[in-house]
Amino acid sequence: MDVVEVAGSWWAQEREDIIMKYEKGHRAGLPEDKGPKPFRSYNNNVDHLGIVHETELPPLTAREAKQIRREISRKSKWVDMLGDWEKYKSSRKLIDRAYKGMPMNIRGPMWSVLLNTEEMKLKNPGRYQIMKEKGKRSSEHIQRIDRDISGTLRKHMFFRDRYGTKQRELLHILLAYEEYNPEVGYCRDLSHIAALFLLYLPEEDAFWALVQLLASERHSLQGFHSPNGGTVQGLQDQQEHVVATSQPKTMGHQDKKDLCGQCSPLGCLIRILIDGISLGLTLRLWDVYLVEGEQALMPITRIAFKVQQKRLTKTSRCGPWARFCNRFVDTWARDEDTVLKHLRASMKKLTRKQGDLPPPAKPEQGSSASRPVPASRGGKTLCKGDRQAPPGPPARFPRPIWSASPPRAPRSSTPCPGGAVREDTYPVGTQGVPSPALAQGGPQGSWRFLQWNSMPRLPTDLDVEGPWFRHYDFRQSCWVRAISQEDQLAPCWQAEHPAERVRSAFAAPSTDSDQGTPFRARDEQQCAPTSGPCLCGLHLESSQFPPGF
């Protein structure tokens, strides 16, 4: 028996042992428990959400009692909406009531209707059982699933007992989904999402709710868990654009400390929504997210940055992920109604400015998300498709000078990021632009200045910050040899002084090393790489490009 067979048999035995523990029930040796324990067994240690506390809960405050009475009065309104769903499913009244709060005993049926789980069950009869059995036999992530289940909502009465009924149902859902969607397979966040569904839905309904949540374009949640998801990049770019517009100082500090590239606030936000705040606020935010869709993510992120503006400006590069998570958790450590009130106001503001969703990708981009185009250092971040036009060149580079080199045919080309092409030789002519070759008429006709609006269109999807490129490999692959001003002025001067041109051509080379030093330094400077985007033969007057590129 070779090593592969031994490893395969060991994994199979490990998988069977884990499944057997869940099949036996609570504590993997006691008789199988029939469900969650009743409320009276916890001696008034359970709140209205099902969270078990270590000490006995104090009596209800006036605010909590008012909230319970309010939920009871709202129940009849939600029942009426469910009875006439075709009328209310796209109405403003549904959104208004979702922000005010969804009653707990209505949340399960409402989630099922929003995610259309009944239709999925009718279209796929018996498929969940098949996927579940296949997952038990061939799961590759069962150890990770078992480890994550042990830490999922353990303070809730449904998931308090190890290997209990709800933990077994959660295992079945995750195994079935791993088999159902191999592209996503299993991720850590799926355990918390499925556990939230199990609080209010049966096992099979919770499975199809998870399927619909990740598959629907309305919520775009699969991009956070799939390696091929392109929507998440568009949401991340839009989030950076929104935060840079509303909180420029905060975003400027994040860029200065290079924190945005190390941790994604949007990805952190998804984890916070799953298992980082109080369960009551988590459920209310999920209610809004299921009703509004992906456009609710931008307002939530904007509120988090706005509330934590002072703390985020003091965030250093040391441990940015932990600091970000702590700041976001502190953001939601406040009254639920207050958070939802600010969320609704932010939602209306971003919708009015059309900043709640990223701009649609162009057809040639396919599924890839649009990248933001930096206008200038310290300015606004523009995205493709924005109504605002990108700014013009800075004043100190009013007009570039075309190279005076004779026309040459390109020998080879090398593709560069963003669609640009680097050519080994530098052709003078370009389509749509007159050739700037030296005029034969007179010395003054040797110069051809090109205005900015007549320049060839440069790639705008490059991730460039200022005159310097951040990525070393990209900078190495897109060197542009800049022609010095002396070389550009030499043909003009020779045209005006033909005698000096003949004298310099027949002059003997100097043997003095000191006299040749400036020319050698100049040649070395010309051969040295210069910064800037690949311009495909277009040479500027200076070796540094304007900060607006």
From Swiss-Prot:
Domain Rab-GAP TBC: 101-293
Keyword Membrane carried by entry: yes
Sites of S-palmitoyl cysteine lipidation: 318, 325
Compositionally skewed regions (Low complexity) per UniProt: 398-417
InterPro entries referenced in this protein's UniProt entry, alphabetically: Rab-GAP-TBC_dom, Rab-GAP_TBC_sf, Rab_GAP_TBC_domain
Tissue expression remark: Expressed in heart.
UniProt subcellular location: Cell membrane
Record PTM text: Ubiquitinated by a CUL7-based E3 ligase, which leads to proteasomal degradation.
Region (Disordered): 350-443, 507-526
Membrane protein topology class: Lipid-anchor
Biological role: Acts as a GTPase activating protein for RAB5. Does not act on RAB4 or RAB11.
Note: TBC1D3 is encoded by a collection of very similar paralogs with multiple copies of each paralog, some human genomes encoding well over 50 copies depending on ethnic origin of the donor.
Record protein name field: TBC1 domain family member 3H
